[in-house]
Amino acid sequence: MRKANLNDLDTVMEIVENARALLKADGSEQWQGEDGYPTRLTFQMDIEGGYCWLLMYGNEIVGTATLMTQGDAHYMHIVNGKWNRPGHPFATIHRVAISGKYRGKHFANYIMSHMITLAYDAGVRNFRIATHDKNDRVHNLVQNFGFIKRGQVYTGPTDRDLRNVYELNLD
């Protein structure tokens, strides 16, 4: 794994577009909105902020994820549930995507493990991730890592922006 730089942006977007098509084929509305989220600008800001990470296989970029250790305002107001540790600092993992060329090889497990380890080494013990109700790939991934579904959050102003949220608490 390594941090992304702006020279990686085209490859990151290829991976994201491939993942967007997979989500659509799976029947998920996630990443299908008219606003094009996540956009090239989203990833440019992630890279410039030092939040975007790349999974490497040899010299090839095979996946990407964003790790935010400052918390995220969207996760402050949970509905239909509650956080296990509501007042504690937390990290959020966003925009996990694997190249279609490497799909099915469990590379998302490496990304999740690395994101958790990075934040843990920085002192974070609580992790949150949000995903669309029909994104079974992420639901299964996070549950395999011990995340527990806690409720839902809005990532935007409409009902289409309602996401299931999961939390992992480590001691």
Enumerate the language-model features and the residues they cover:
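Conserved beta-strand-loop-alpha-helix junction that forms the acyl-donor binding cleft
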Residues: R103, I129-H139, P157
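Conserved acetyl-CoA-binding loop-helix of GNAT-fold acetyltransferases
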Residues: I98, G104-T117, N140, N144
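Conserved GNAT acetyl-CoA-binding A-motif
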Residues: M112, A119-T131
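Conserved beta-hairpin
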Residues: Y51-A65
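Conserved acyl-donor/pantetheine-binding loop and adjacent beta-alpha core of acyl/acetyltransferases
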Residues: T66-R95, R103
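Conserved catalytic-core motifs of GNAT/GCN5-like acyltransferases
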Residues: A130-T131, Q143-R163
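Conserved GNAT-fold acetyl-CoA-binding loop/helix
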Residues: A21-T42
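A short beta-loop-alpha structural element at the N-terminal edge
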Residues: M1-I15
